[in-house]
């Protein structure tokens, strides 16, 4: 996700190749030099595939939790060719936005979501790859104008589908992924607390 304007912004994750991300930005009228930082939610490949090349090629700083940075180091993604930093518990100011993390439940080292507060007093929460919606997630996204949240399965279809048993168990666990029903049950709470857009 690119969050910002035509002059500057940040990426939340970079799960495609660097070239795909550069091309997508260009298609949308954005220059890669507008990207001032990459905030990583967790170390799974579908969230970090382009991080190392983008950050190295364009001197983009990477922010993540301590656990995620440690996992990236173990994967050889911290190659010394770009700057990285543990996200501050008080938030980080980048591209005229305040970006704060909140913990999420997923099967990785230390996953998180982000709340982005803009200079014009708008707020956006991004919560992907959640096993369940904890009170910490609920409190973090409460009142945000826009909430981007992922749910990716119907429980019955998953249970009766072709996936191996262990994968089904992983997806359904509290460190897996939200079901569509669980997510939809929360949407009314978001709206009651001021959210006007859900993606």
Task: Walk through the language-model features, giving the residues of each.
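Cap/insert and terminal regions of metallo-dependent hydrolase folds
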Residues: 135-199
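A short helix->loop->beta-strand "cap" motif at the edges of active sites that frequently abuts
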Residues: 8, 58-61, 192-198
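Active-site metal-binding motif and surrounding structural segment of the metallo-beta-lactamase
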Residues: 19-64
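Active-site neighborhood of phospho(di)ester-bond hydrolases with catalytic His/Asp-centered motifs
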Residues: 11-15, 35-43, 63-66, 125-128, ...
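Divalent metal-coordination and catalytic microenvironments
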Residues: 3, 42, 62, 99, ...
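Conserved beta-strand hairpin/beta-sheet module of binuclear metal-dependent hydrolase folds
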Residues: 1-28, 112-129, 146
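Active-site glycine- and acidic-residue-rich loops that bind
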Residues: 126-138
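Metallo-beta-lactamase
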Residues: 66-121
């Amino acid at each position: 996700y690119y969050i910002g304007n035509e002059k500057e912004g940040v990426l939340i994750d970079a799960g495609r190749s660097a070239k795909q991300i550069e091309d997508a930005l260009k298609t949308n009228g954005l220059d890669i030099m507008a990207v001032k930082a990459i905030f990583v939610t967790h170390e799974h490949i579908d969230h970090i595939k382009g991080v190392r090349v983008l950050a190295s090629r364009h001197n983009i700083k990477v922010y993540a939790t301590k656990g995620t940075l440690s996992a990236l180091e173990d994967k050889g993604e911290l190659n010394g060719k770009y700057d990285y930093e543990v996200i501050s518990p008080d938030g980080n100011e980048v591209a005229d936005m305040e970006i704060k993390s909140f913990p999420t439940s997923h099967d990785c080292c230390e996953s998180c979501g982000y709340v982005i507060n803009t200079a014009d007093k708008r707020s956006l929460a991004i919560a992907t790859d959640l096993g369940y919606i904890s009170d910490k997630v609920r409190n973090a996204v409460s009142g945000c104008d826009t909430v981007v949240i992922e749910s990716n399965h119907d429980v019955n279809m998953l249970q009766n589908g072709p996936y191996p048993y262990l994968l089904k168990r992983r997806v359904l666990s509290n460190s897996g992924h939200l079901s569509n029903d669980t997510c939809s049950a929360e949407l009314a709470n978001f709206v009651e607390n001021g959210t006007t857009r859900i993606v």
